[in-house]
Every structure is written in C-alpha cells, then in structure tokens.
Regions:
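Short hydrophobic alpha-helices and adjacent helix-cap/hinge residues
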Residues: 1-322
Length: 322
C-alpha cells in the first residue's frame, strides 16, 4: 500500500517513501508494520499520532512509512525487511504477535514497539516485563479475553455452554496454542470453525448452524478484528449470539463485545515511539498491559434473538445500544 492510496483512505498522514529522504530535510522515520488492511486502522491511527505529538513529533518533523500485509501474514517478513533496508529509525508493529516476531527477526538493532496478544517473555521477545532488554518493548493484552468472553457469553446465553462455537484464523501461527485452553475445557462441546479470508466466513457460519452451536466466540486476532462488520452481518443473518473483542462489532449489530480500548493502546504506543526517538532505549521502557476494558451490549439485537439480558450484565456494561 503506497502513500497516495493511504492518504485517500485514511486522511492526512505523514507517509513518505524512505527513498525520498535524501531529497528532503532529514527527519526521523517511523516504519509501521501492519498485518491487516488500511481500513482496519482508520479509527485508531489518530490516537497514535496524538501520542507522537505529545512527545514533540508531528507532520513536518517526522516521516511515517507504512507497510500493510492486507491479512496475508506470509508477507510480513519481507515487509519488515523492507523497513530495515530503508533504515527506519524505529519500527512499530500495530497488532498481532506474528507481526512483532517478523520485525524482531528482521533486526536486533533498530528499536521496535509492539502491540501483541500473547506473553512476550514466553515468545522470547523480551527478557521481562519490567526490564525488556534488547531492542523491543510495547503493550500486550496476553490474550486475556478467551476466558472472559466465555464467562460473559454463558451469562448472557446459558445454553451456549452445551454447544459453543469458536472462530479462529488458521493462518495465524499461534492459533493452536492459544485456543488449547478452550479445547481442553469444552472438549466435544466445542465447534471450531476457521476463516483466513473473507470468503471463509459464510461457510463457517453454515457449519456452526449445522453443528448446532448455540453461541460463538470470535478469537481476538488482527484479521478477525478487522472483519467485525462482516461477522456481525452474518451473526444477524444466522441468528447467532456472538461475542467479539472489538467495539465496532456491537455497533454493527453483533450481540456484544468485550475488549480493550484500542485508542488508549495506540496513544501509548505513540508516546513510546516518541520517547524512543527522543533517546530513551526500548530496554528501559517496561512492557505495559491495559487496565481499561469495555463491555458493549446491543440490546436491540438481544431482543431480536429472544434473549433476556440479565440485569447484572446490563449493570456492568459500559455501553448499551438500544
């Protein structure tokens, strides 16, 4: 995805080709590696830029060079290598453990700032949360939503415990290890369905219906997060109670969402990036974990599905869509 296309879709952005640096006043360059498409970041990048601004960086004194994998994770190593060859001053990986791993494999000298959903110590990205060491730091959610999503969905739809669907992306190399707890807990009661491209969603929902799933959890993962609207439309068509990680899912008609406030994460990543450009070493910036989560319930969808939302659940909701 080149600069002209990006600006047309996202709006004003400081995105100049790295090769053009010699033709302009030298400014620091931020390489941004994204596993998904441009559209998935439209609502989040302003928070990233705001974090940069608070550390002294805005259009005119910093260049931002984007690389988009468009959901094709096998492209990430080459895209990361391209940013390294272009001599980016810092590389930011916006979403997905596989993205951070690709950047880490590409360089052990250029600073890297990540957002991931797994334990960075177990993955070998950092030495510890408090003292990352090396050239990498960032934010992790440690895939904390699987158990909480199950708890919330069972409270909303108790019968889902008898037959629960789980939607995953098989293209993600971490899928097996991250869904293992659900498989171990539910055994034969779990209906595992997959989607690695947009054309896979319809067959996945058809399989859920055929197997008698009474509810569905969408695994928190960059590609699946970026297709929240499409998943919501299918959930409505198949009358399937579904919980997702991203707020847009509930806004689009899905039953409910529970997850981090992505604007907060992107804002903090912007701050970390700016601090690194100002001279702070990634090794001295602790890996952060989010402390704020949002539960959004679409009451209109619940009524259409014949679900009486428990008052205890409504009382805990941060937002109720009526």
């Amino acid at each position: 995805m080149r600069r002209r296309e990006f600006i047309a879709l996202v709006g004003s952005a400081s995105a100049w080709p790295l090769t053009a640096r010699s033709q302009q006043v030298t400014v620091p360059v931020i390489g941004v590696l994204v596993p998904s498409a441009v559209s998935s970041m439209q609502n989040r990048l302003p928070a990233f830029r705001q974090g940069l601004k608070e550390t002294g960086y805005a259009e005119g004194n910093v260049a931002i060079e984007f690389r988009w994998a468009e959901g094709q994770y096998d492209k990430l190593p080459a895209l990361a290598a391209d940013l390294v060859r272009g001599r980016a001053d810092v590389i930011v990986t916006l979403g997905g453990t596989v993205t951070a791993l690709a950047a880490k494999a590409a360089t052990n000298t250029i600073p890297i700032v990540f957002i991931i959903g797994a334990d960075p110590v177990e993955l070998g990205l950092v030495n510890s949360f408090g003292r990352p060491g090396g050239n990498i730091t960032g934010i992790t959610t440690i895939s904390m939503f699987g158990g909480k999503h199950m708890e919330l969905l069972f409270e909303m739809v108790p019968e889902a415990e008898a037959r629960l669907g789980l939607l995953v992306n098989p293209a993600n190399p971490l899928v097996e290890s991250l869904v293992r707890p659900a498989v171990d807990q539910l055994g034969q009661r779990l209906v595992l369905v997959e989607a690695r491209t947009e054309s896979d969603f319809e067959p996945a929902f058809a399989m859920l219906a055929k197997q008698g799933a009474r509810g569905l959890i969408v695994w928190e993962e960059p590609f699946l997060n970026s297709r929240a609207d499409q998943i919501a439309a299918l959930a409505i068509r198949y009358a399937m109670p579904v919980i997702h990680s991203v707020r847009n899912f509930a806004l689009a008609g899905g039953l409910m969402s529970y997850g981090v406030v992505y604007a907060d994460l992107f804002h903090q990543i912007g701050i970390y990036t700016g601090r690194i450009l100002n001279g702070t070493k990634p090794a001295d910036l602790p890996v952060l974990q989010p402390s704020k989560f949002e539960l959004v319930i679409n009451l209109k969808t619940a009524k259409a599905l014949g679900i009486a939302v428990p008052r205890t659940l409504l009382a805990r909701a941060d937002e109720v869509i009526e």
